[in-house]
Amino acid sequence: MKTLSEIKEILRKHKKILKDKYKVKSIALFGSYARGEQTEESDIDIMVEFDENNYPSFSEYLELIEYLEKILGLKVDLITKKSIHNPYVKKSIEEDLIYV
């Protein structure tokens, strides 16, 4: 099982590709890994923000998920910052966020 530090380091090493190829403006972890409550079965919850003028297509978004799963070796649940509409869900996620 990967540690939070290992995951952050992997994401940092791939930051240029994430920005240049996948148009990621910012990336943050939340959920069980961010809270230190992960188990062997845990996936990793990631929130990304894209540049307003350079939003990826749906297929590019799916490619990003596949890329993250490949480099992390974990199942990834990916959301965008703009996709959180429920204020209670947003608050809960924001409490966990660890930006990379």
UniProtKB/Swiss-Prot annotation:
<feature type="binding site">
    <location>
        <position position="45"/>
    </location>
    <ligand>
        <name>Mg(2+) 2</name>
    </ligand>
</feature>
<keyword id="KW-0479">Metal-binding</keyword>
<dbReference type="GO" id="GO:0046872">
    <property type="term" value="F:metal ion binding"/>
</dbReference>
<keyword id="KW-0808">Transferase</keyword>
<keyword id="KW-0548">Nucleotidyltransferase</keyword>
<feature type="binding site">
    <location>
        <position position="45"/>
    </location>
    <ligand>
        <name>Mg(2+) 1</name>
    </ligand>
</feature>
<feature type="binding site">
    <location>
        <position position="77"/>
    </location>
    <ligand>
        <name>Mg(2+) 1</name>
    </ligand>
</feature>
<comment type="similarity">
    <text>Belongs to the MntA antitoxin family.</text>
</comment>
<dbReference type="InterPro" id="IPR043519">
    <property type="entry name" value="NT_sf"/>
</dbReference>
<feature type="binding site">
    <location>
        <position position="43"/>
    </location>
    <ligand>
        <name>Mg(2+) 1</name>
    </ligand>
</feature>
<comment type="function">
    <text>Probable antitoxin component of a putative type VII toxin-antitoxin (TA) system. Neutralizes cognate toxic MJ1380 by di-AMPylation.</text>
</comment>
<keyword id="KW-0460">Magnesium</keyword>
<dbReference type="InterPro" id="IPR052038">
    <property type="entry name" value="Type-VII_TA_antitoxin"/>
</dbReference>
<keyword id="KW-0067">ATP-binding</keyword>
<dbReference type="GO" id="GO:0016779">
    <property type="term" value="F:nucleotidyltransferase activity"/>
</dbReference>
<dbReference type="GO" id="GO:0005524">
    <property type="term" value="F:ATP binding"/>
</dbReference>
<protein>
    <recommendedName>
        <fullName>Putative protein adenylyltransferase MJ1379</fullName>
        <ecNumber>2.7.7.108</ecNumber>
    </recommendedName>
</protein>
<comment type="subunit">
    <text>Probably forms a complex with cognate toxin MJ1380.</text>
</comment>
<keyword id="KW-0547">Nucleotide-binding</keyword>
<dbReference type="Pfam" id="PF01909">
    <property type="entry name" value="NTP_transf_2"/>
</dbReference>
<dbReference type="InterPro" id="IPR002934">
    <property type="entry name" value="Polymerase_NTP_transf_dom"/>
</dbReference>
<feature type="binding site">
    <location>
        <position position="43"/>
    </location>
    <ligand>
        <name>Mg(2+) 2</name>
    </ligand>
</feature>
<feature type="short sequence motif" description="GSX(10)DXD motif">
    <location>
        <begin position="31"/>
        <end position="45"/>
    </location>
</feature>
<keyword id="KW-1277">Toxin-antitoxin system</keyword>
